[in-house]
Design a protein with these regions (language model features):
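A short, N-terminal "cap"/entry segment at the start of jelly-roll beta-barrel domains
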Residues: 1-60, 74-75
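Double-stranded beta-helix
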Residues: 2-22, 59-61, 65, 119-142
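Conserved short histidine dyad/triad with adjacent acidic residue
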Residues: 47, 63-79, 114
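Short, conserved beta-strand element in jelly-roll/cupin
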Residues: 65-68, 77-94, 133-135
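A generic "binding-loop/recognition-motif" signal
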Residues: 69-71, 80-81, 100, 116-117, ...
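Short acidic-glycine-tyrosine-enriched beta hairpin
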Residues: 98-115
Length: 142
């Protein structure tokens, strides 16, 4: 049963526990040619939750998300786009409908097809993941 739908990435991130996120922070490094996780952690903190949008164009958006143990997102799906992640740090649990819960680690790549509910939790942090999907993707919460 659909309970909520959202395309505003700042609202999505705030509701997922990144309370200090705002548009200025999210877009500060948007479409920068080269970025580095350690540089972001020096600026925003290793032991805090934050997000920055690295890529944004007509075809895809990419958001780097740093979260602490026990943090993650709400169960949701994207009705019109697949979503991909690259794990940069930490240990995560990915629940994917029809596949159950999987543990993922640094250098793992995860793909969830459109329409498939999923839930992400950092279990050993700080954890960093790079999420890639269509720009302004619709999140439908279940």
């Amino acid at each position: 049963m659909v309970t909520n739908s959202e395309t505003d990435v700042v609202k999505v991130l705030k509701d997922d526990g990144l309370k200090d996120i705002d548009w200025a922070t999210l877009e500060k490094y948007q479409n920068a040619t080269t970025t580095n996780l350690d540089d972001f952690r020096d600026e925003f903190g290793r032991w805090t939750s934050w997000a920055v949008r690295i890529a944004y164009n007509d075809f895809f958006g990419g958001v780097l998300i740093n979260q602490l143990s026990g943090k993650g997102n709400r169960k949701h799906y994207h009705p019109d786009a697949d979503e991909n992640w690259v794990i940069l740090d930490g240990e995560w649990e990915w629940w994917i409908e029809g596949q159950g819960t999987k543990k993922v680690f640094q250098n793992d790549i995860i793909v969830v097809p459109k329409g498939v509910p999923h839930l992400i939790t950092c279990v050993k942090g700080p954890g960093a993941r790079y999420a890639i999907t269509k720009p302004d993707v619709n999140h439908v919460y279940v």
